[in-house]
Amino acid sequence: MTRSLKKGPFVDHHLVAKADKAVTNKDKKPIKTWSRRSMILPEFIGLTIAVHNGKQHVPVYITDQMVGHKLGEFALTRTFKGHPADKKVVRK
């Protein structure tokens, strides 16, 4: 279910403030955030945001195709190791 258009996009205020500061200072360091729920705005294009996945911060470089998506979509929280292989006995 998508968010209502009359509400507009949700972005944490501290993330917007950090992004504006990075743009004005032309800072290339990643911006650390735990806000996976924040939507990517056009002002974030070209920035690297380190999104927390529950264990570590995953660096995400923001491109124009990511605008409108949420930050959490690009930092996976679960690791899939694959299904266990069949352990069949090989007789010689």
Curated annotation (Swiss-Prot):
InterPro entries in the record: Ribosomal_uS19 (IPR002222), Ribosomal_uS19_bac-type (IPR005732), Ribosomal_uS19_CS (IPR020934), Ribosomal_uS19_SF (IPR023575)
Q: Does the keyword field hold Coiled coil?
A: no
Signal peptide: which range, if any?
A: none
Q: Name one GO biological process term.
A: ribosomal small subunit assembly
A Pfam family cross-referenced in the UniProt record is: Ribosomal_S19
Record keywords, A-Z: Ribonucleoprotein, Ribosomal protein, RNA-binding, rRNA-binding
Sorted alphabetically, the Gene Ontology cellular component annotations on this record are: cytoplasm; small ribosomal subunit
One MF annotation (Gene Ontology) recorded for this entry: rRNA binding
UniProt-listed PANTHER family: RIBOSOMAL PROTEIN S19P FAMILY MEMBER, SMALL RIBOSOMAL SUBUNIT PROTEIN US19M
Would you identify the family this protein belongs to, as annotated?
A: Belongs to the universal ribosomal protein uS19 family.
> What does the UniProt record say this protein does?
Protein S19 forms a complex with S13 that binds strongly to the 16S ribosomal RNA.
This chain's protein is named Small ribosomal subunit protein uS19
Q: Which organism is it from?
A: Polaromonas naphthalenivorans (strain CJ2)
Gene that specifies this protein: rpsS
